Amino acid sequence: MYKRQDGDGLVSQYNMTLVEELGLLKMDFLGLRTLTVINDAAKHIERTKGIKINIDEIDYNDPKTLDHISTGNTNGIFQLESAGMQSFMKQLRPKSLEDVIAGISLYRPGPMEFIPKYIKGKNEPESISYACSELESILEPTYGCIVYQEQVMQIVQKLAGYTMGQADNIRRAMSKKKQYVIDEEREYFVYGNKERNIKGCVANGIDEAVANGIYDSMVDFAKYAFNKSHAAAYACLLYTSPSPRD
């Protein structure tokens, strides 16, 4: 550790991975112009129209705002500016903040392959299916699709008997693309590991081929997936963006 010459900040020579392993808290702070734009818009409305807007009290299930997002006319709105995302929102037609959160999580390289299945499940609930019955309680809120990192953790806990800590380790290995860990954990997920007290899917009555298929889906998904809290923070921010305009 050393102190910066241009201020009071402390700098570590360790990279972010080692800092976390040493037990230090690592936080990422985003400096977003969107926050300034929203604040300036709220001040302008108060100054010109005498209407004071409390951003913290916005109705996150306001139908007018959701309809606006569904039009795809979202230039200048955080996370919704790309043509691909605008097209996706027109297809998704979100009816709640939960839909917006899922939309942000899905529009990424890994989860993106689930978009057609998600939209079909949303519009045609009878089309939803699960690789095994144990997945239903985990994936029902997202129409049978894996959408969040937390769902990966729930799956390995419920199907294979991982502890919460072990589940977080496998989530992290997948998101960091640590292939040697991913390959090792596949065997534990399917067949278990006595030393780590992991029972495994097969011992829990889940077919070996089904278990491997579920693991493949988790690996493909988790490489680029968000955790839900991350997506929720983004969704609240983008949801706020059109509100002052309306």
Specify the residue positions occupied by each region the protein language model found.
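Mg2+-dependent phosphoryl-transfer active-site scaffold
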Residues: K3-A225, A233-S241
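A short, hydrophobic C-terminal helix/tail in secreted or cell-surface proteins
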Residues: P242-D246
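Pyridoxal 5′-phosphate
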Residues: H230
